[in-house]
Amino acid sequence: MSPSIARRRPLLAGLLATALAGAVLLVPAAAEAATTCTSGASEGMNPYYILDNEYNASLATSSSWQCVWSTSQSGGTIDWGADWDWAHASPSTSSDVLAYPAAVLGWEWGWMYSDTGLPIQLSSGKTVSSTWDYTFTQNTSNTFDVSYDNWITSSSDPGDSNPQAEMMIWLDHGGGAGPAGSQVATVSVDGASWDLYIDTDNTWPIYSFVAASTTTSSSLTITDFTKVLTGSYGLNSSYYLSSVQAGVEVWTGEGQIDSNTYSVTVG
C-alpha cells in the first residue's frame, strides 16, 4: 500500500525557528551560498524564500536532519537547493510525510514579502506560470515526491486562517509514495497527461495532479490546473490562488534536490 500523506499545517513564514528545532540533529549542507539547517527558518530570495519546513520532525529519529540553501538569483529566476536525511522514530508513523523543503512565493500562514503578485482570484483571467529544472539525488532509497504545492484561500488576505483547498502537482515520486485520496480522472493539462486524485477526508480538500510521465524539467501554467478544478470539480472560482510552492515531500531517506532554474510568473 502506498503511504498516505498526513497533511500539514505549515510553519508561519516569518518564523526563524520553532519548537521543532531541538528535535533534529543539524548537519550543514556542503558549501552553498547561504544555508540554514534550522527548522522553520528560511533564506530570502525576494520575492521568493527557501523554507526549511520540517513540520513533522517530532516524528523523526534524533539523528534526522535537513538543510536548505539559496545559490543565485537573476531577476525572477532563482537557483536553490536542499538536502536531508530522514527516518521515522516509530513504524506507526511511517505513512506520515516528515518534511517539505521548498521555494515559497506568496502566503504560508503569513507573508514574507508583499510584492509577489499573489493572490489572484481564480475568476480573474490572470495566469500564473512556472518553469522548474532540477536534479534529484538519492544517497539512500527515498520515499518522496517532487511537487508544486499551491494554497487556495477564500480571502485575498487569509492571515493565519486555514486555506479552502490545496492543489498539488506531482512531477516525480518514488519509494511507494502516493497522493492523498482516490483517483477520479486522467486529464490533459499543458500538453501532458495527469492522474487527478481528490481527498475530502481532511481539514480542507486536497487535489493532486500526478504526472503520468515523470519529469525533471517542466514549464507549466499553474492556472490551467485550477481551471480544471473550477470547471469540472466544484472548486469555487471566487477563491484565490495565494501561494505557489515547489519542493520535495520526504517520508524517509537521504537525498538532495538542486533546483538549477526556477521561476514563477504572475501575469
Predicted feature locations:
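Solvent-exposed N-terminal domain segments of exported/luminal and surface proteins
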Residues: 34-97
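Long, compositionally biased interface segments
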Residues: 213-267
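Ser/Thr- (and often Asn-) enriched beta-sheet segments in non-cytosolic proteins
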Residues: 77-79, 119-121, 127-135, 186-188, ...
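Short helix-loop boundary/capping segments
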Residues: 155-223
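Short, surface-exposed beta-strand/loop "edge" segments at domain boundaries and coil↔beta transitions
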Residues: 86-98, 139-143, 157-161, 177, ...
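Short, hydrophobic/proline-enriched secondary-structure or compact coil segments at domain edges
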Residues: 80-84, 128-134, 148-150, 241-250
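Extracellular-facing segments of soluble proteins and assemblies that are Gly/Ser/Thr-biased and enriched
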Residues: 98-184
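Secretory targeting and sorting signals
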Residues: 2-33
